[in-house]
């Protein structure tokens, strides 16, 4: 709760919350109400539990009104974008990654059984939906949404990148086997994204020859008799470009298109064109994957960050394991509240890491940047989750330093901790 209050002052993310009319919120102590709302929903404690532990400082009804009437998924995304942008200004964020790479992955979250989204998930062994997230190589979450278990996750992979309004704009996508399909490879390439998934069964996939007489020394055995139909791509190239432009300008949903492109029908000419282009891109990707050991290591490293974020966000969601309402909009908001909470904690931890590193350097201790880069901001041992909560909205004593001063006095003469 202190972390949310701190980031509310430093970042100002509560400014995005308020009535749908756009007028000033007619509630007492709006910042406090919004901080508690994010805490109640991001942790899955709910308004009643938080109000009880706050010892009548706020009622469950007041928190419910703030969550239902003053927040939407779009407003929560905007608040999270503010946090991401402030995080990106920190030097330490640049030590973790350059922001050009993103990992896309989902994790199962339990819900009640009788709702239109919930399904049984074979891989995870639970019943509910998938929290599908885009995690930057700098550890911060760029976009989240709640999707059904039964869909192919690759359908949603482009949407998160197009709806990401933050200063961190990745162009390389890493995902697992669920995060790829032939049409997705084609669409991602046309949109300027480099889709490089971790493909579990790559040995079972077809490598396509550019022409029937093309042969390759040493690796020709990887290629069968499959040949790219360049004529098909050329014929439908204007359609591919028009569709891609419509998606990039927001006139057509990438999710809607990719669902349609999942229909393997002879009459679906657009599907056949995207599939053929995807065969080209996937063949190139497979060859890059086999030839570049550093790329394989990068894919593993960034997808591990996504898995770590799932664990971190689940640790913050300590109020329960089940989303206890059947409203799909509410379920989506819970996932986004949890992302906002996690990003606030990541930003606060990154500020503390910066201050600690600068303090050690000012005391004469050598700081190895490679060692510093191994410290994850998914730090939990400094956070107290349980007990009576007291909301302190006093502004921080000082604005956190964003720059690493690992050479004592080079940037900040004198005692930086004063």
Report each predicted region and the residues it spans.
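Structured, charged N-terminal subsegments at the starts of enzyme catalytic cores
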Residues: 1-53
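Intrinsically disordered or highly flexible coil/loop and linker segments, enriched in small
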Residues: 13-20, 44, 48, 76, ...
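Short coil/turn segments at secondary-structure boundaries
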Residues: 18-22, 51, 80-82, 95-99
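Short, conserved catalytic/metal-binding motifs centered on acidic residues
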Residues: 50, 102-107, 173-178
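Catalytic or ion-translocation cores adjacent to nucleophile or general acid/base/metal-coordination motifs
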Residues: 53-94, 119-238
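Flexible, glycine/threonine-enriched loop-and-boundary segments that flank and lead into catalytic domains
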Residues: 108-119
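Long, compositionally biased intrinsically disordered regions
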Residues: 222-418
């Amino acid at each position: 709760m202190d972390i949310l209050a701190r980031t509310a002052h430093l970042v100002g993310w509560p400014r995005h919350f308020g009535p749908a009319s756009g007028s000033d919120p007619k509630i007492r102590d709006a910042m406090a109400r919004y901080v508690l709302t994010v805490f109640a929903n991001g942790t899955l404690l709910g308004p009643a539990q938080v109000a009880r532990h706050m010892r009548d400082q706020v009622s469950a009804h007041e928190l419910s009104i703030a969550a239902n009437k003053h927040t939407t998924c779009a407003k929560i995304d905007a608040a999270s974008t503010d946090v991401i942008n402030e995080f990106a200004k920190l030097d330490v964020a640049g030590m973790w990654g350059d922001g050009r790479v993103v990992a896309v992955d989902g994790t199962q979250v339990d819900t009640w059984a009788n709702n239109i989204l919930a399904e049984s998930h074979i891989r995870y062994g639970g019943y509910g939906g998938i929290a599908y997230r885009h995690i930057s190589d700098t550890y911060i979450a760029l976009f989240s949404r709640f999707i059904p278990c039964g869909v192919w996750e690759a359908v949603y992979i482009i949407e998160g990148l197009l709806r990401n309004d933050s200063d961190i704009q990745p162009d390389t996508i890493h995902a697992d086997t669920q995060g790829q399909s032939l049409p997705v490879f084609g669409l991602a390439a046309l949109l300027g994204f480099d889709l490089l998934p971790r493909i579990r069964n790559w040995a079972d996939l077809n490598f396509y020859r550019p022409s029937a007489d093309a042969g390759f020394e040493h690796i020709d055995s990887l290629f069968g008799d499959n040949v790219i139909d360049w004529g098909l791509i050329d014929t439908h190239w204007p359609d591919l470009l028009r569709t891609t432009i419509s998606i990039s300008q927001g006139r057509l949903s990438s999710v809607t298109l990719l669902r349609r492109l999942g229909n393997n029908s002879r009459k679906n000419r657009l599907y056949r064109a995207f599939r053929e282009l995807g065969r080209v891109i996937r063949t190139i990707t497979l060859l890059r994957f086999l030839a570049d050991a550093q790329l394989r290591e990068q894919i593993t490293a960034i997808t591990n960050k996504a898995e770590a974020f799932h664990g971190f966000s689940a640790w913050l969601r300590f109020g329960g394991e089940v989303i206890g309402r059947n409203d799909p909009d509410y379920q989506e908001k819970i996932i986004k509240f949890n992302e906002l909470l996690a990003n606030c904690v990541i930003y606060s931890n990154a500020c503390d890491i910066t201050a600690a590193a600068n303090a050690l350097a000012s005391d004469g201790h050598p700081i190895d940047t490679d060692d510093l880069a191994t410290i994850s901001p998914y730090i939990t041992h400094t956070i107290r989750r349980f007990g009576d909560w007291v909301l302190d909205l006093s502004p921080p004593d000082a604005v956190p330093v964003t720059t690493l001063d690992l050479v004592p006095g080079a940037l900040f003469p004198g005692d930086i901790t004063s």
